[in-house]
């Protein structure tokens, strides 16, 4: 199957904990004076750590730069110090220190030595930025600023006081890493490396870039050196690699070593030209801002100007290089080391295939470029995993769906989960290995426990008959009573009523016979390993006592002494011999349990990480589908939750049930066959075969019933969620009883299926226990017959029973494994059906990043019709574009062509259903037209990266749906990195700030489900504030005032006009009074453009469609105005 769409701002490889550190060292050198190149639509800069400046840092002679950490173009006081450009001559209220070439914007009147913490002071001595700066990036941590979509600065627009305020808001003291389009420039102009952004780049090749804010001040000496024709003129510029590169316009003096991570110092430095300046102190480097990417330190480099940025101290503007943000054409490569990776990119000489390889520098550059190119195309293990964009199914183990074919079988589904068993993260791999080790150890201890128990029984079997723990020692009336009778008779001979001498001789004969029996017993071989070997000392003493009884006969005192000695020695032997066996059995059981719990603890994190990654992948995939028209939200939630649980359950089945159960079966059968005999092993094998066959047959039936139950549950939950979402409609139409009857019918069907599942489970459990216990009965009967015949010791009965009971656990797991695996595969199959839906729109393989030039929009001969039905699971998306030519009768849009110039306002009107909103979807590329082209700034949207141009478009829809969260969250959704001040400024322009502040909780007020706690006008104005905060280049309003009253409409129109100022605006309007000031009005009828022109031009047409609609609305408004007093009086 085709891998599902991966949004370029969702790096799944990071979810697995894979980390790679990439280090590049670059130099920031003095820039030549050029025109100011700030554009009108700067994206707001991101948060940075606020450092309160000291009083000394504001001394004018130190050439300080004061930079705002986060200023919005919406705010009226954006004061940032910047370096002067010859083309910009600031006027009041700007002033420049006479002794400095820097031209700071004057700060607010209350800005004094106790400046707010949001202002930072950065020394700008000539040596401050001339030393190499070492940037260390780590792609495992990203800022939320990555996900906000704000426009960038075009490089070619001239500066002006109006646009300067927007432009400066994007810069900060850490502007070394900036967003731009490097690969586009490299493909179209390889020599762009030497042109930079000095104002000489033409518009065709100009890419969005931002000049470095922090530049060393150019004093008189440096200006004199810059005017020297022989001196190389370095130029700083910025690319999508977010790395500052310094190159020289003088090609013969290039000394950059193929832009590798160790750029050689330039021969001409400002330090030589301005040697009177003191070197940069360490304190000034540490005053540079730390980032929002969570804490960090500034490491001390090799030189005073060295700075190391990591994800802990790097600004969100300094986003790390990641393959998801680069097309494959970016000529970067890496050489991975133990802890870092170095960047390299081809030099101008190798890129343009020049012949300037006579010098050593050019040769070095070409060599490095060659190795860079080969490293780029290489997929060896030494290349960095974070530089080249690879296929989603190869780069990401978090999405096994991309490895499964359409409509996969159960075996294919299981194999698709195997990558989870060997994760990418080293810690997770160690957890898996530890889990396997604990599993094997627990199984060995589990099998060893029955053996220890059998040895314990055998140890008691070989005890002496007259020991205290033996039957003979426990009762004087049992066991071997000959010696006790002898002693009793001997003691009676000492009594006053002594027997005659004949009695003594009979006692002597009895003692002699007892001695022979004891000698024979001492030489008997026991049926136990513990009985093998020479006779024990107690047996020898009993034999000696027998001999003494024969020789002495009536010497009763000697017999009594021998018996006492024998009892004392046997007691010591009983305590010492079986104690280890007695303790070994419980210790083995406890250790096995401990290792099992440790295994579960180690693997839980691995399985939960896998489930989390899989759910994130499914979540992202759902957002790429046009699927929600056919499935209820409740059904989708149940489907995804069950699918996630099935992933975790199946991972445990694969690693801890299938293989361990087979291993335990083999061990048990081997022990039974070797210790007890082949018949017992055969009986056990037959029992297992019948058990498995019965379980498979019953579980197959249960799986079918379980699928029906799951379908009924999904329908029940979907109906519940759908009914609750439309609770107001239910109350309005008094349909509570109808909804209850529908829900009751679905619930009863679910209950019936649930009862069937439980009944089949009870039958399965009873059958399993019956089969198993019959097998146990047969094995024990055979073992007992062998023990009774004297062929096996008594302990083997315990061994067989223990092993069979031990085998009951995996036998039960065989049924559980088969049953749960079948059910989990059924749940996972449903999820795979959803995941196998292909998104209607995907990025092209060679997608280009969008280059903003102003925001002009053009539709050229567009024809479009919606697909007749949604995609079926596993089917490929239907062809769209020039290959498919639907009939004109089915066309929603037929040969529509118009253009919107940059910064202009165009309105689209017409009856309902003519395709006005469809134009917005085509502009966003939610669908592709059947024919024709949609262009933005002369770039076909089919050839662009989806997110690169969608970030430049802001939409205010007709039905504004808000998240069930706070107002602050909903407004900042347009730009999550915005500050509270920027949010308030956007809300004020949207005429909603006063309403929010009157609420008890202000911006922390929760808006409710879909924002139903707010009125329609309030939701619309929150949507406008969100779009204002996003600051897009193209603004789209889709009938945003059609359902509002006139008073609210006027407020929203005022916010519209504020937002549309300086932006390309596309308005779909129902009320013509709202678009009378549009630069162009397009009237659509039956999928075609019927009329086009300005408001005045269209009204001049006598029988024009627009004029008729205008007159109709004016007449309706007049009637409403006349009837309003009557309604109020009544």
Swiss-Prot record:
Subcellular location per UniProt equals:
Mitochondrion membrane
> Topology relative to the membrane, per the entry?
Multi-pass membrane protein
Q: Where is the composition biased (Basic and acidic residues)?
A: 503-523
What if the gene is knocked out? Conditional knockdown results in reduced formation of plaques. Subtle but significant growth defects in parasites. Reduced number of parasites per vacuole. Partial conversion into bradyzoites. Altered levels of iron-sulfur cluster proteins. Global decrease in cytosolic translation. No significant effects on mitochondrial morphology and function.
Renumbered to this chain, the Low complexity biased-composition regions fall at 468-502
Lineage, broadest ranks: Eukaryota, Sar, Alveolata, Apicomplexa, Conoidasida
Q: Identify the residues that bind ATP.
A: 910-917
Any transmembrane segments, and where?
406-426, 574-594, 653-673, 678-698, 761-781, 791-811
Q: EC number(s) for this protein?
A: 7.-.-.-
What name does UniProt use for this protein?
ABC transporter ATM1
Q: Where is the ABC transporter domain?
A: 857-1111
- Give one Pfam family, short name only: ABC_membrane
Identify its protein family. Belongs to the ABC transporter superfamily. ABCB family. Heavy Metal importer (TC 3.A.1.210) subfamily.
Q: Please cite one Gene Ontology biological process associated with this protein.
A: intracellular iron ion homeostasis
Q: Please note every region of biased composition (Polar residues).
A: 195-206, 305-315
Which Gene Ontology molecular-function terms are recorded? ABC-type transporter activity; ATP binding; ATP hydrolysis activity
Q: Which species is listed as the source?
A: Toxoplasma gondii (strain ATCC 50611 / Me49)
Q: Does the keyword DNA-binding apply?
A: no
